[in-house]
Amino acid sequence: MLIGIRISEVWFGVITLFPEMLKSVTDFGVVGKAIKQSSIEVCTWNPRDYATDNYRTVDDRPYGGGPGMLMKVGPLEAALNAAKSVAPAGSKVVYLSPQGRRLDQALARSALSVPGLILLCGRYEGIDERLIEDEVDEEWSLGDFVLSGGEIAAMAIIDSVSRLAPGVLGHNESAEQDSFENSLLDCPHYTRPEIYRDKRVPEVLLSGNHEKIRRWRLEQSLLRTLQRRPDLLEQRELSEEEAQIIQELRRGQLISET
């Protein structure tokens, strides 16, 4: 666990498989100096420390097939509970995801209004959707590009928020501008167990019907993009199938999960 001296200005908890990565921001520069001066505090929790098997397994295969692995809910939930037990009351849990609200100066400044941030760093293909639904308050993103994990985003958030805290800098600095690629947001993902907190994995992902699974994932992807980032659709050349699904969504037709 990486710990600075506990103070009330800015508190960060980071759930990560690679806590050592955080040293590149906590040991150097503005953030490192602020930690030494007790202006901010950064703590980390590693889900591997909460795995229950001898191999300290933290990932599993996704239901419905597909490439890659998902982070298991058990170790993540235990790490989150450990973080919450020491976080200031009223802290927010933020999942670092390309589907989230884009980080900008206004969002960084708004973080100063909450007692603390617990930053959840994904790896592999992401984390089980049910944990996001039950435990995450907000999703934040650096932009429309893919990273290998949430650690770089966590470091960017720690740096951008810390520099706005009283006494850390003498003045505010402008946020860097990012350039983006047009893409659709991802669909929900699920891994074992099949039932978690009385929530079942969508039946279509258990069907073994690859065409139905492909269609469901496309529908969910388009729905999320339409709801969360409609600007991406304006810049995207839709296929005939995508255009048809968008029309159905805009007419208010429900997407089947079976």
Curated annotation (Swiss-Prot):
Residues annotated to bind S-adenosyl-L-methionine: 122, 142-147
Catalytic activity: guanosine(37) in tRNA + S-adenosyl-L-methionine = N(1)-methylguanosine(37) in tRNA + S-adenosyl-L-homocysteine + H(+)
SUPFAM superfamilies (UniProt xref): alpha/beta knot
Keyword hit for Cell division: no
Superkingdom: Bacteria
Assembly and oligomerization: Homodimer.
Name the record gives this protein: tRNA (guanine-N(1)-)-methyltransferase
Species per Swiss-Prot/TrEMBL record: Hahella chejuensis (strain KCTC 2396)
Biological classification of the source: Bacteria, Pseudomonadati, Pseudomonadota, Gammaproteobacteria, Oceanospirillales
Gene: trmD
